Amino acid sequence: METKQYPDMECDVVIAGCGVAGLYAALNLPTSMRVIMLSKGAVDECDSMLAQGGICVLPEGSDYDAFFEDTMHAGHYENRRESVDIMIRSSRSVINDLLAMGVDFERKADGSLDFTREGAHSRPRIAFHADITGKEITTKLLQAVRKLDNVQILEHVAMTDILTGERDGATVCTGVVAVPVDEDNSLRPADELANVAEGVHAGELFKIHARHTLWATGGIGGVYDHSTNYPQLTGDACYIAQEHGIKMEHLDYVQIHPTGLFSPQPGRTFLISESCRGEGAILLNAAGERFTDELQPRDVVAAAIREQMKQDGTEHEWLSFAPVECDVVTGHFANIRARCLEDGRDILDEPIPVTPTQHYFMGGVWVDKDGRTSMPELYAAGETACNGVHGKNRLASNSLLESLVWGRRAAWRMRTGESLAVEQAGEPALDGRHRALSADTLAIDDLARAASTQAVEE
């Protein structure tokens, strides 16, 4: 692939990453602000696209305490309580925005949202779209962003460093250094891409000067032999943060998902969603015996599988869909079934081999409740950031929600210099109606208004 060359650029906001955190941040900025977004690979090669199970939401105000406790319990009570509170109370307005952008969540016969349950959840509270929720959400947000004249997306462009300046005696971020990359170079971490000796010509580097910078570069799965992540996610923001003395937190908090589809080959591992176990799928050992409670937190289930593998002397255990109703398998888990059929296994007829696999990074670049890092004018959101909401171990389906909440909060802080107020528990109504956050018009306000008008006309 021949890479495109770019001149130095200027904008109001540069966003490194095109997952849900970056896209939603762009939508929550006014159209008067010029935004440049970078995607290290193709724009659809982000981990947000891979999220299967769903996105958590507070179904009603009475679930607040249970939702809070489930999140804290899964995180071994090492979570930042303020962050957990913000995420939960922000969930309903975020879901309404997604509905307003056309996200097609599953519904009950009466038209209300349907919810599924996953491990360590005390009740169903996860909105979903079959078993490709992340793809549905990310695709709709990307379609919305592509309608904005003020946003420019640069595909196959990697961030290699940040630009800095001085303000009131302090070092501030003033943008990023970037480089066009082909498919092979997209798998390299930032330190290699910035090193001319490693094969990147110095003349290809270019600067993007910006008032505000948002890191939304995803996780670290690319540094593992077996991961559910895209291989170009190589922890670039963490490397750059280390080089500039930017505060990081809990870099050892890496989540291993219990059920990756086993393959002896290196490369990205296909995820078998936790919602499968939430709907009744069970784990079996080599003798066909159930050996653990499948709905415990992820780290507990992963440890149980590893221990059973050690006892059995195997590289995997088995996941059986026998207890799951046939129409749930063919409907809710159609994508998972299709992928397993590629390996010659029909989950309707036989169990599939699963093994614990690197999945998520709870640590990262430290941020506050508004997504601000320790360097002024530098923000981070999504898996790149550590706002403490997940503690030591993430609760299933909190990742998409957290990314969206902090993407929006970062955008608000950039625009106003203030913290975004948080809704009361149980508000607003889950009616799919976008509610403007201020008198100033944001990009999402215009898009939601246009979508509503079109729906009425149709």
Per-range role (PLM):
Residues V13-M37:
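N-terminal Rossmann-like FAD-binding beta1-loop-alpha1 element of flavoenzymes
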Residues V43, I240, I246-I352, R413-S419, ...:
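An anion/pyrophosphate-binding glycine-rich loop and adjacent beta-alpha core
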Residues G41-M72, H76, Q255-P258, P266-F270:
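Conserved N-terminal glycine-rich FAD pyrophosphate-binding loop of Rossmann-like flavoproteins
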Residues V14-A16, I208-G218, A380:
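Short hydrophobic core segments
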